[in-house]
C-alpha cells in the first residue's frame, strides 16, 4: 500500500507563476507543508532560548539578593557560571557554523570539478 502523504498534489507541484516543478528538483519545503506546532518549533532560534533563561536568572538573583551576604555571593557565582555556559554555547554554535561552511565549500569544489571533467570529456 502506498503512502498518500508523500505524493505531490497538483497544487504543490506548481509554483505561483504556473510552471510545474519536478519532485526531484524541489529541495525546499514550504511552511504550509508543516503543521502549526512544528512551524513554531522550527522558527525559534537559539537566541530566544538564551533570553528566556537570562530572564529566569535575573528573577532568581533578585529574589535571593535580599536574603543576606551568602545568598548574594551564591547568586553572583551562579550568574557567572551561566554566563560562561552561554558563551560556551555560542562558541559551539559558531564552530558548528564554520564547520558547515567548510563542508559546503568542499562539496561545491568536488561538484565543480566533476562538472568540468564531464564537460571536457564530452568534447573529446
UniProtKB/Swiss-Prot annotation:
It is found in: Cell membrane. GO terms for cellular component: plasma membrane. The keyword Cell membrane applies. The chain crosses the membrane at residues 59-75. One of its GO terms (biological process) is shoot system development. Residues 92-124 are annotated as: Required for DVL/RTFL small polypeptide activity. Residues 71-91 have a biased composition (Low complexity). It comes from the Eukaryota. The keyword Thylakoid does not apply. It is a single-pass membrane protein. Keywords: Cell membrane, Developmental protein, Glycoprotein, Membrane, Transmembrane, Transmembrane helix. Residues 1-23, 60-95 are annotated as: Disordered. Glycans are attached at residues 35, 38, 88. Its main location: membrane. Belongs to the DVL/RTFL small polypeptides family. PANTHER family: DVL19-RELATED-RELATED (PTHR33102). Small polypeptide acting as a regulatory molecule which coordinates cellular responses required for differentiation, growth and development, probably by restricting polar cell proliferation in lateral organs (e.g. leaves and petioles). This is Small polypeptide ROTUNDIFOLIA LIKE 3.
Amino acid at each position: 500500500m502506498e503512502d498518500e502523504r508523500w505524493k505531490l498534489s497538483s497544487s504543490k507541484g506548481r509554483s505561483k507563476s504556473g510552471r510545474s516543478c519536478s519532485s526531484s528538483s524541489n529541495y525546499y519545503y514550504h511552511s504550509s507543508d508543516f503543521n502549526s506546532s512544528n512551524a513554531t518549533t522550527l522558527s525559534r532560534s537559539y537566541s530566544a532560548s538564551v533570553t528566556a533563561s537570562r530572564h529566569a536568572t535575573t528573577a532568581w538573583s533578585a529574589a535571593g539578593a535580599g536574603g543576606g551576604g551568602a545568598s548574594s555571593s551564591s547568586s553572583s557565582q551562579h550568574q557567572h557560571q551561566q554566563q560562561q555556559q552561554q558563551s560556551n554555547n555560542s562558541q559551539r554554535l559558531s564552530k558548528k557554523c564554520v564547520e558547515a561552511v567548510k563542508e559546503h565549500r568542499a562539496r561545491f569544489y568536488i561538484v565543480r570539478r566533476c562538472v568540468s571533467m564531464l564537460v571536457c570529456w564530452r568534447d573529446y
